[in-house]
Amino acid sequence: MQILLANPRGFCAGVDRAISIVENALAIYGAPIYVRHEVVHNRYVVDSLRERGAIFIEQISEVPDGAILIFSAHGVSQAVRNEAKSRDLTVFDATCPLVTKVHMEVARASRRGEESILIGHAGHPEVEGTMGQYSNPEGGMYLVESPDDVWKLTVKNEEKLSFMTQTTLSVDDTSDVIDALRKRFPKIVGPRKDDICYATTNRQEAVRALAEQAEVVLVVGSKNSSNSNRLAELAQRMGKRAFLIDDATDIQEEWVKEAKCVGVTAGASAPDILVQNVVARLRSLAVAKPFRWKAAKKISFSKCRKSCESIFVKSIKSLAA
């Protein structure tokens, strides 16, 4: 069996930043530290932080007065921010800068009296936070997930309409929805730069190339991770057997026992230790040597972080108008 490792894979800069904020808060203030929603969607990461004293909550009312509160990487609505401000809390914001960019796009549209359409998955915390940035009572904020949703949608003013996207969507699916939006609402305006983050796009490109070589693709990521689910779906659409796994213990021998080539990748919130454990598990099932498949242009983590920060700074300047 040959094992191909997608590159890039695993942690993105926004996830690493969010985890570091929680770790630093624990180191400085000590336990307990309260985190609104799972800081990132990965069971291993969340369990590790919980063991160190992080308490994950969904409602601000669960946080006692005088406590430390951290917003997750997915961002929160303006209503949640206002509620936290009204309490005697010390608040730190771990929202991914690229999610904040989308928040600012929505807030700008709201100020200008434009209506906004968000492409995203209902119920996802990032979507809830982004929808909650719109506050103009005379306008409207709408959520669509598919081209069918677009054709059924009615807005108040088609002349002043813009769209944004959740940052962790499938590039292919989003393209189809955007095409439908432009046909349904010819005057709709999109973001100056694609809202789907570079880490999501790069990892999807890597899986696309990986799936051309591998018979089976294993995606390391939790079930509630949007970007991890999109990676598994992409490989499946390419006709490959693909499985989303939390860790190596999820691997079933029958998945890979006949495979000559197995591809492995990880979602943006999955640490590399989990990938290492998956490789070890595969090697225990067969004589296997892992190869690093350069399925996408390799970008060093430091460059990813600089890119993330650069995009954020440029976005602030462009959206401040």
Curated annotation (Swiss-Prot):
UniProt-annotated catalytic positions: E126 (proton donor)
Binding annotation for [4Fe-4S] cluster: C12, C96, C197
Cofactor binding, per record: Binds 1 [4Fe-4S] cluster per subunit.
UniProt keyword annotation of 4Fe-4S present: yes
Coiled-coil features, chain-numbered ranges: none
Pathway: Isoprenoid biosynthesis; dimethylallyl diphosphate biosynthesis; dimethylallyl diphosphate from (2E)-4-hydroxy-3-methylbutenyl diphosphate: step 1/1; Isoprenoid biosynthesis; isopentenyl diphosphate biosynthesis via DXP pathway; isopentenyl diphosphate from 1-deoxy-D-xylulose 5-phosphate: step 6/6
GO MF annotation terms: 4 iron, 4 sulfur cluster binding; 4-hydroxy-3-methylbut-2-enyl diphosphate reductase activity; metal ion binding
Binding-site residues for (2E)-4-hydroxy-3-methylbut-2-enyl diphosphate, renumbered to this chain: H41, H74, H124, T167, S225, S226, N227, S269
Names of the cofactor(s): [4Fe-4S] cluster
Enzyme class of the recorded protein, top EC level: oxidoreductase
Entry binding sites for isopentenyl diphosphate: H41, H74, H124, S225, S226, N227, S269
One Pfam family it belongs to: LYTB
EC number: 1.17.7.4
Binding site for dimethylallyl diphosphate: H41, H74, H124, S225, S226, N227, S269
Keywords tagged on the record: 4Fe-4S, Iron, Iron-sulfur, Isoprene biosynthesis, Metal-binding, Oxidoreductase
Reaction(s) the record says it catalyses: isopentenyl diphosphate + 2 oxidized [2Fe-2S]-[ferredoxin] + H2O = (2E)-4-hydroxy-3-methylbut-2-enyl diphosphate + 2 reduced [2Fe-2S]-[ferredoxin] + 2 H(+); dimethylallyl diphosphate + 2 oxidized [2Fe-2S]-[ferredoxin] + H2O = (2E)-4-hydroxy-3-methylbut-2-enyl diphosphate + 2 reduced [2Fe-2S]-[ferredoxin] + 2 H(+)
One record GO biological process: dimethylallyl diphosphate biosynthetic process
Function: Catalyzes the conversion of 1-hydroxy-2-methyl-2-(E)-butenyl 4-diphosphate (HMBPP) into a mixture of isopentenyl diphosphate (IPP) and dimethylallyl diphosphate (DMAPP). Acts in the terminal step of the DOXP/MEP pathway for isoprenoid precursor biosynthesis.
Subunit relationships: Homodimer.
Family statement: Belongs to the IspH family.
Protein name as it appears in the record: 4-hydroxy-3-methylbut-2-enyl diphosphate reductase
Organism encoding this protein: Escherichia coli O6:K15:H31 (strain 536 / UPEC)
